[in-house]
Amino acid sequence: MQSEMAIDTVATAEKSPLELLQQTKASVEAIIAKMLSIKQQGTPKSENRELLTQMFLNFINLRQANRSILIEEEKVRTETEIAKSPVDFTTLELHNLMYEKSHYLKANKASRDFKSRYPNIDLISEQDFFSDAPEAIKSQTLSNDSSHDLMLKRLNFELHQRKELCKLRVRLEQQKKSLLESNAERNKFLSSLPVHLKSLKKASLPVQSQLSLQNQKKLKYHNLAELLPPPLYVIYSQFMALKEAFEENIDVEVSGSLKDAQTYARQQAEQNSESLRLEVGVDEERQRKRLKKVGSDEGGVYQVHPLKVVLHVYDDEITDPKSHELVMLKFEYLLKLNVVCVGIEESEDGLEKNILCNLFPDDSGLEPPHQSAKLILGNDHVFDKSRTSRPYKWAQHLAGIETLPEMSPFFTDKDIQYSDTAKGYASASDHRNVQTVLQRIRSQKKTKLTLV
């Protein structure tokens, strides 16, 4: 019996755990079947002890097989863990490579789809690269592929060129900054130059008067006179001609805002050009707009042109006439009424004592000089008495504003012929005579000074 057990133990040692487990299972089943048959047949139970011993031996073999299976399982698990580590590492590398691939594909697509501001700029040509690139770039070896290596070198050379251009840009910006500072200093000097020129001009006035040089004021007034409205220009030219022809003791100036006068002249030029472009079919609409504009400008009837003519009248009976100024007249032009108004500059006298009132018969300056002005002023036909300057008839004649008379010059009634109106028309020639106007102004002023 012991020899059989020893044989079984050696046999189990040679078999695999799984075969041993199956064999032990079959042996246990056979022993159990034998024990059941002994019990059923009623044979002596002396054999049961031997069967139990074999049963225990089989249990021992079963536990041994189970232990061997567990050891082998642990060994396989350990080997699996050892083999899994490089697989996981390889898998991670694969995912990284796939991610890099997708990133490169996206970057490649973005580069291909990129629309530059200068899409026609190509990479530097090979000929220019070999002729202009420095040896440090051409001697590099960046890739085993010759074409790819050449492309990388061309890109590096282009990068080198761009860096040099950036340095040049910095130098140019510094140069620009220095030039701007220099220009600022020069502008500062130029802005202060008019003050120095003004003081120099003021200091040179005595020299100019000694050398009889041309007066710069005269040129200035001539330039301003080009912007005068036609009536004021006629007055200015007549007084200047009188002064130059007869050496009359007067001074004529043009005063006012040059900027406003230029703006007004520009607006008039634009209106004239616009009126030329209008067609005949829009005459009615243009007339409605004109009527509407006149109604809206009712408050601006006394709108004055920006420039004025100032006349200085000196005493002609003393040695130094310019040392004694008799009166200073101001001629201004009313745009809406088309009349020239005259007033005494800086006069403290009332309008009743003004020497210009009734300088000629029936010419107080309160009545508009022509019918169009009367229609614009309305039913009263009265000029604004609060204004210091008035539209005298002699001023209109001096300015060349000629209108149709209210009464026909061919009178048939003797009473009408010798009326005040007829006398006024008879004196129109005196109105146009500049010397006569100056003589009367001097006479009125001297008479007033004598009475005072």
UniProtKB/Swiss-Prot annotation:
Gene Ontology BP annotations: mRNA processing; mRNA transport; RNA splicing
Annotated localization: Nucleus
Family: Belongs to the THOC5 family.
Name of the molecule in the record: THO complex subunit 5A
Keyword Zinc appears in the UniProt entry: no
InterPro entries hit by this protein: THO_Thoc5
Domain of life: Eukaryota
Keywords in alphabetical order: mRNA processing, mRNA splicing, mRNA transport, Nucleus, RNA-binding, Transport
Free-text function comment from the UniProt entry: Acts as a component of the THO subcomplex of the TREX complex which is thought to couple mRNA transcription, processing and nuclear export.
One cellular component term from this protein's GO annotations in UniProt: THO complex
Chief place where the protein resides: nucleus
Quaternary structure (record): Component of the THO complex, which is composed of THO1, THO2, THO3, THO5, THO6 and THO7.
GO molecular function: RNA binding
